C-alpha cells in the first residue's frame, strides 16, 4: 500500500502498462493498489502507458482549436440546445453548476466561462433509442464542409471517440480489479450501447472575474455526473481539485501523454461513497486560451444507480434507484436550466 504524506489527498501518476500486459502479475497488483488508494482518497488519479497515440492526442487539440476559431454564427448553427441528443456546440456561458441544487435563482447564477462541442455514439433517427426519445441519444452534427473540412475535424473526433471507448473498457477493468466483486462486476454497465459523451472545451483567456464574493470561473465547483471521466489537458494549467478534509484547492499540472481519471457520482454511489467523487473546478489563471478534451463515461441507460454490495438483495432498493438515464438527465438539465 502506498505510504501517504497527506492521506486525504493522494493523486498519483500510475503507469498502467503492467496491468495491460498481465493483470494478474505482481507488478499489476501495485498498479491496482495505487488506483484503489487514490479512489478512496481523492477519486482522482493520472495514467500513462494507456496506448492512446500521441499523434491522435495532438490532432484532437488541433481540431478543437480549428472549430472554436470559426465565426460565432457558424458555431451557432450547431447549438446543442436545438439538436437531437444534445450534440454540437455548447454556447459560452450557458452552463452553471450553481443551478443544480437550486442554490441560486437562474438570474443570479454565475455561468461557466467556457464553450464546448459534444459528440457521442452516432445513432440514426430510426434507432430505437432515438425514436423513443431516450436522453442524449441521436445523430452527431458537424460543421459544413466548406466551413471546416471533415478530415480536419469530424474524422479526427470520430477516431478519438473510438479510442476513448477502448480506454474506458480498460479503466473499467482496472476499477473492477480494485473492488471485491470480481472481474465481471461492470458487465451490465457496459451493455446496450453504453452512454458516453466526448466534449471539447475552450476556456478563453482573460475573462474570469470576481463577482462580489464569488469567482466566475471557466468551470465552477462541481462533481461529475457519470461513472468516471477521462480528461486530457493541454499545456496550460487550470484544473483544481478540493481536499475534502481540509478544503484546500490543489492544482493538477498538465503532463504530456497523461490522462486524468476521476471517479464520478455514479461510481461513488456504487461504492457507497468509499470511492470519492471530489469537487473540482477550472480556473484559467494564465493569459492563454486553454483547451481540454473530456470523455464522460456513464454506461447502460437502464442500469440502476445503487450500491454494488446490495445488488439483487433488496427489492425496494432496486425499485427506488434511478436509472443512469434518469440520474444524468436530472443533473445535466438542471445545470443548463433546460
From Swiss-Prot:
Domain Fe2OG dioxygenase: 193-299
Residues involved in 2-oxoglutarate binding: 290
A GO MF label: dioxygenase activity
GO BP of this protein: small molecule biosynthetic process
Cofactor(s) demanded: Fe(2+)
PANTHER family given in the database record: 2-OXOGLUTARATE (2OG) AND FE(II)-DEPENDENT OXYGENASE SUPERFAMILY PROTEIN-RELATED
Family of the protein in this entry: Belongs to the iron/ascorbate-dependent oxidoreductase family.
Protein name: Clavatol oxidase claD
Gene: claD
Amino acid at each position: 500500500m502506498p505510504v501517504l504524506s497527506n492521506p486525504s489527498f493522494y493523486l498519483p501518476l500510475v503507469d498502467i502498462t503492467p496491468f495491460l500486459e498481465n493483470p494478474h502479475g505482481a507488478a499489476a497488483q501495485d498498479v491496482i493498489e495505487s488506483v484503489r488508494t487514490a479512489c478512496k482518497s481523492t477519486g482522482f488519479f493520472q495514467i500513462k502507458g494507456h496506448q492512446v497515440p500521441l499523434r491522435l492526442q495532438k490532432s484532437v487539440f488541433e481540431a478543437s482549436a480549428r472549430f472554436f476559431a470559426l465565426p460565432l454564427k457558424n458555431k451557432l448553427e450547431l447549438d446543442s440546445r436545438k439538436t437531437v441528443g444534445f450534440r454540437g456546440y455548447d454556447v459560452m456561458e450557458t452552463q452553471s453548476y450553481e443551478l443544480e441544487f437550486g442554490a441560486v435563482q437562474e438570474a443570479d447564477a454565475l455561468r461557466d466561462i467556457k464553450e464546448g462541442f459534444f459528440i457521442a455514439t452516432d445513432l440514426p433517427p430510426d434507432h430505437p433509442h432515438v425514436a423513443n426519445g431516450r436522453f442524449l441519444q441521436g445523430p452527431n452534427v458537424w460543421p459544413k464542409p466548406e466551413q471546416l473540412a471533415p478530415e480536419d475535424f469530424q474524422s479526427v473526433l470520430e477516431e478519438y471517440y473510438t479510442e476513448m471507448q477502448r480506454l474506458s473498457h480498460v479503466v473499467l477493468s482496472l476499477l473492477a480489479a480494485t473492488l471485491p466483486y470480481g472481474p465481471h462486476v461492470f458487465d451490465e454497465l457496459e451493455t446496450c450501447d453504453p452512454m458516453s459523451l466526448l466534449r471539447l472545451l475552450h476556456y478563453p483567456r482573460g475573462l474570469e472575474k470576481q463577482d462580489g464574493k464569488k469567482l466566475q470561473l471557466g468551470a465552477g465547483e462541481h462533481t461529475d455526473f457519470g461513472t468516471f471521466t477521462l480528461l486530457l489537458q493541454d499545456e496550460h494549467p487550470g484544473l483544481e481539485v478540493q481536499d475534502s478534509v481540509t478544503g484546500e484547492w490543489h492544482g493538477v499540472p498538465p503532463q504530456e501523454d497523461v490522462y486524468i481519471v476521476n471517479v464520478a457520482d455514479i461510481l461513488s454511489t456504487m461504492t457507497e461513497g468509499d470511492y470519492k467523487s471530489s469537487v473540482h473546478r477550472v480556473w484559467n489563471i494564465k493569459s492563454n486560451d486553454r483547451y481540454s478534451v473530456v470523455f464522460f463515461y456513464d454506461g447502460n441507460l437502464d442500469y440502476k444507480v445503487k450500491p454494488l454490495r446490495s445488488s439483487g438483495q433488496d427489492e425496494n432498493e432496486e425499485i427506488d434507484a434511478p436509472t443512469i438515464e434518469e440520474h444524468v438527465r436530472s443533473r445535466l438539465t438542471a445545470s443548463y436550466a433546460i
